[in-house]
A protein has these predicted regions:
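Structural motif
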Residues: 91, 95-97, 150-155, 383-394, ...
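ATP-dependent adenylate-handling active sites, centered on carboxylate activation for C-N bond formation
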Residues: 113, 191, 202-389, 404-461, ...
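Core structural elements
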Residues: 186, 395-406
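Acidic, carboxylate-rich catalytic segments that either coordinate divalent cations
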Residues: 487-496
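Charge-dense polyanion-binding interfaces
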Residues: 144, 149-152, 161-163, 441-469
Length: 496
């Protein structure tokens, strides 16, 4: 595989004093230059840069991306907070910034601290070079000349099978010396160290799971509704759990949404097409089936490059499919809902299950590598004071979602992706559920079922993630025959 610098950098950014050679290249490719305080930013449309001020009209930082305020909607231009910045930075950021949903990066520029924070799931991923003290959306913006190839860790890339379906966990990237910031950690711009800022104490278990499901439903619906007030919105509709929750939360304004389903020649896609079409017809939803479009090799090479050579799998060649929606402003998906599905738990796990770097790496389902084990060990040292079930949830959120799910944030730049299950309020709601509400059984769980029931109970009359008849008996066998490596990965997760 020959590495190339991306031709198109739409939706990307760089923060800090870039080397002159890098800055000149990015400006030539269309970057916009702006300083907030004394910190330089380079951004490529449609990436939005919003100046943040406190109640005293003092500039305290900037937001990148598409943040959504629960009261005023999509944030643009300038964001004015209703309180002054105080000395308790951690509490201030948690209350004022993590009240936002949407997809964003927050750069704090205060006298007492200069830091970078991701949103609750790191849906706008970023990487950084501690030596050059620069931060960017992907690695290529931090490199010059032959460094793209010379600093590429090809051995680790191949060992982790990134091209097929692997990824770099624990803050690793495909390039030596460049690290990825994980969700729930901030980057200190003074010394380029990272520190956990959430959670700082265990999330308490809710005494009323149904009421907490209502909170989750409201949070999802509020975010989607605000998007409809700001632009045109396409929403994924599948046979899955998360898109059903999004639809249930959007019942009152579903007529303002355009629902889409990918019509691909796969077993999972056939379930999606059948159930999505039935739901749309029954409830009068605007719905379209979009064809699976394959990239040629040149487009696949460009896509790998735009993502910093940190992501692989079928999407390398399937990514042009989303181009069917480029006339829309936003695409709403269901990523983040897995946090409420006990994804890394095993049936015999308890809050006291012994965990170490080796067992966490096995849960990730990837080959055992010294680099990965060391990275996970460092992460585990920063994740003390939580029971084992919470630690496994944080591993999924931080090591997988932040390093895999959103390492691909910049491959497709129109429309803007927003995942309304991602917010601090939503994640607190999910993590506060009793274990029995989160464990999956028959491809769903009580939290999902109750959330859908509260919003639109008739949607539960259509099966979740299955046909609901004899065809389900053969689905796993068919998948195992077509993709045997997935069986091995599942075994590593279960018994590794």
């Amino acid at each position: 595989m020959e590495l190339i610098y991306p031709r198109v950098l739409d939706g990307q950014f760089l923060i800090g004093d870039a080397l002159a050679e890098i800055q000149a290249r990015l400006l030539e490719q269309g970057a916009k230059s702006k300083c907030v305080g004394d910190l330089p930013f380079l951004t490529f449309d449609p990436m939005q840069l919003v100046v943040v001020k406190d109640s005293s009209n003092t500039v305290i930082g900037a937001l990148l991306g598409t943040p959504v305020d629960s009261e005023t909607g999509v944030v643009s231009g300038e964001y004015r907070l209703s309180v002054p910045l105080n000395d308790d930075i951690d509490e201030f950021v948690e209350k004022q910034i993590y009240s936002l949903s949407g997809s964003f990066v927050f750069v704090l520029l205060a006298d007492q601290a200069r830091r970078i924070y991701l949103d609750a799931c790191g849906s706008l991923s970023l990487v950084y070079d501690p030596e050059r003290r620069t931060v960017a959306s992907t690695s290529s913006l931090l490199l010059k000349g032959n460094e793209l190839s010379d600093r590429f860790d090809r051995e680790l890339y191949d060992f982790l099978r990134v091209e097929r379906d692997g990824w770099f966990p624990g803050g690793l990237t495909g390039h030596i010396g460049i690290k990825r910031l994980m969700p729930n950690f901030y980057l200190d711009l003074e010394d380029f160290s990272t520190h956990r800022h959430w959670p700082i104490e265990p999330v308490g278990e809710t005494s009323d799971p149904s009421d907490t499901c209502q909170t989750l439903l409201n949070e999802i619906g509020n975010t989607v509704r605000h998007l409809t007030e700001h632009g045109t919105v396409s929403v994924a509709l599948t046979a899955g759990n998360e898109t059903r929750m999004i639809l249930a939360a959007s019942k009152d304004f579903a007529n303002k949404l355009n629902f889409v389903t990918v019509n691909a020649d796969t077993h999972a896609a056939s379930i999606d097409v059948i159930h999505a079409s039935d739901i749309a017809k029954r409830f009068g939803l605007k719905h379209e089936l979009i064809p699976l479009v394959k990239a040629d090799n040149a487009a696949a090479d460009e896509w790998r490059s735009r993502n910093g050579y940190c992501f692989g799998g079928p999407h390398i060649y399937n990514h042009p499919t989303i181009a069917a929606l480029k006339a829309r402003d936003y695409f709403v998906g269901g990523l983040g809902g897995e946090i409420g599905r006990a994804f890394f738990w095993r049936p015999d796990d308890t809050r006291e299950t012994k965990l170490d770097a080796g067992t966490i790496t096995a849960r990730l389902g990837m080959p055992i590598s010294k680099a990965v084990t060391e990275a996970v060990s460092i992460w585990l040292d920063q994740t003390q004071g939580f029971d084992s079930l919470t630690t496994l949830d944080l591993a999924y959120l931080e090591l997988r979602m932040g390093c895999w799910g959103f390492a691909v944030s910049y491959g497709d730049y129109t429309p803007i992706d927003i995942h309304p299950l991602i917010s601090r309020r939503s994640f607190v709601a999910m993590l506060s559920m009793p274990p029995e509400w989160r464990v999956m059984k028959n491809l769903t769980n009580p939290m999902i079922l109750e959330t859908v029931r509260l919003g639109w109970p008739e949607l539960l009359e259509t099966p979740l993630n299955k046909f609901g008849d004899h065809r389900d008996r053969f689905s796993r066998v068919r998948r195992a025959i077509k993709q045997p490596h997935l069986v091995l990965k599942r075994l590593r997760k279960r018994f590794g």
